[in-house]
A protein has these predicted regions:
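Active-site segment of extracytoplasmic enzymes that catalyze sulfate/phosphate-ester chemistry
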Residues: 1-3, 8-14
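Residues that form or immediately flank small-molecule/cofactor binding pockets and catalytic motifs
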Residues: 2, 146, 190, 204-206, ...
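Active-site-proximal cap/lid insertion segments
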Residues: 5, 27, 31-180, 215, ...
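Acidic, His- and aromatic-enriched active-site or binding-groove loops in soluble protein domains
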Residues: 13-30, 38, 199
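Two-component system phosphotransfer/interaction surface
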Residues: 169, 186-190
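Glycine/proline-rich active-site loop of Rossmann-fold NAD(P)-dependent oxidoreductases
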Residues: 176, 195-196
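Polar, glycine-rich mid-to-C-terminal structural blocks
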Residues: 183-187, 196-206, 217
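N-terminal small/polar-rich segments of proteins
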Residues: 210-211
Length: 239
């Protein structure tokens, strides 16, 4: 995957990759780690990004009748097949993540490593990717850090990907600046009670220019526990 847009150093005329040094595999990265030194790395998978694998070809036992079709999508066999293909892609990512966890364990690094698994957007369906509806902004997130993250809990709280900044600072022993809007997730992960957020803000600006004239569908929004308010800044561009 790419850590920034457009993702090509050559096309942007940059002299270095702003996302950091790129490695061919997680195994290669770990092989080059200095012994006893802290490290930070991120893995951006192409799963579950379209094009999706045909679930029937993978023979994973998924059945169209088992698919859960959201109310805003038509309950049609084609849609059900697409949902199964998406589920198959999620399983592919799960296998990739499992391989990296096993590599950490084999090198004796697993228990001392904070692992964050999340996504940058919802699935690539209507109201999903590059949209500010819940199916586009409500994404999975899981943390693992033995002895420092309470395992097996499910947290019902508003969090933002911006909160990863403060989370990584705290995990590294670096003070979080008082004027930083990012909130560390570690207190919640430890099972502690904290004030947290009562709403999250979302926006869409330039991503996925799918309107005439290579224009985007600019949106600003806020989501609390009761309502979602979205404002289209350029309504003349259509939905």
């Amino acid at each position: 995957g790419k850590g920034w847009s457009p993702g090509s150093v050559e096309e942007s005329r940059r002299t270095r990759n702003p996302a950091g040094v790129k490695f061919a595999s997680c195994d290669e990265f770990m092989a080059k780690l200095p012994a006893g030194k802290p490290f930070w790395s991120w893995f951006s998978s192409r799963h579950p990004h379209r094009p999706w694998t045909d679930a029937r070809e993978n023979k994973v036992g998924l059945r169209p009748e088992d698919a859960v079709v959201p109310p805003h999508l038509p309950d049609h066999p084609t849609v059900r097949d697409d949902i199964l293909n998406y589920a198959c892609e999620v399983m592919d990512f799960d296998r990739e993540a499992g391989e990296m966890v096993r590599l950490l364990e084999a090198r004796g690094l697993l228990d001392d490593t904070l692992i964050v698994m999340t996504s940058d957007n919802g699935w690539q369906m209507p109201r999903g990717l590059a949209n500010c509806y819940d199916s586009g902004t409500r994404i999975p997130m899981a943390l693992r850090w033995k002895a420092k993250v309470l395992a097996g809990q499910s947290i019902d709280a508003f969090v933002s990907l911006a909160d990863l900044a403060a989370t990584f600072l705290e995990a590294s022993g670096v003070p979080v600046p008082e004027d930083m809007e990012s909130l560390s997730l570690l207190p919640l992960a430890r099972g502690e009670t904290q004030a947290g957020r009562d709403a999250v803000f979302v926006e869409r600006e330039r991503h996925a220019n799918v309107r005439q004239g290579d224009l985007s569908y600019t949106v600003r929004g806020i989501r609390n526990r009761e309502f979602r308010y979205l404002r289209q800044l350029n309504p003349d561009r259509g939905p």
